Amino acid sequence: MGVHDTAEHPFLVEVKAFIRACVRTETPLLGICLGGQLLAVLLGGRVTANSPCGEKGTMEVTLTSAGKEDPLFAGIPHEFVSFQWHNDSFEIPADATLLASSSACAGQAFRFGAMAWGTQFHPEVDRAIVDCWARWEEETAPHATRFLADFVLAEQPYLEVSRRMLGNFLGLAGFDTDNGTEKRP
């Protein structure tokens, strides 16, 4: 599924409207993979289908200088393990700030304004998801065992970074990350 596949996936029209509203009202938004691609294209960036920057598997991501200072990545090492599963890739929109890159894909994360972030990598996966995705696609199914083994080897640092990043986002969105409740003034 890609950013322009609204005929095949009509719900994307509503998702795009939701993203536009979040950006307009500065409602905290974290777009992951397709979500980051949708955010990028709605902000004037370009998304390349079947990009040479497509990545699948467990890979290193490097924060830029701006990424090291961004509150989404507070407490996260300059280089960290990520999980990638994308054929398409986004170009950072003109008014956005590049936060992270990888050796294969210059745009791994960006921020627009104070409350909208897009990532190409997946901070939300676990072993079951990695195994499912690897077996799901004809291209990757013969290598599913390797994808899962690579993820398991990197799982501990991956989980530490993912939990920190997602916790940072929830805190920025106004949730008390100690007990999962919304902060009240």
Regions found by a protein language model. Give the residues of each.
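Catalytic nucleophile loop
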Residues: 22-46
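Acyltransferase
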Residues: 125-185
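Conserved catalytic-core motifs of eukaryotic protein kinase domains, centered on the activation segment
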Residues: 6-9, 41, 51
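Residues at alpha-helix caps and immediate loop-helix transition turns in enzyme cores, especially N-
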Residues: 7-11, 94, 129
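Flexible gly/pro-rich beta->alpha loop and the following alpha-helix that scaffold active-site loops
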Residues: 1-30
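Glycine-rich, phosphate-binding/catalytic loops in enzymes
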Residues: 11-15, 47-48, 101, 135-137
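Pocket-forming structural segment of enzyme catalytic cores
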Residues: 43-128
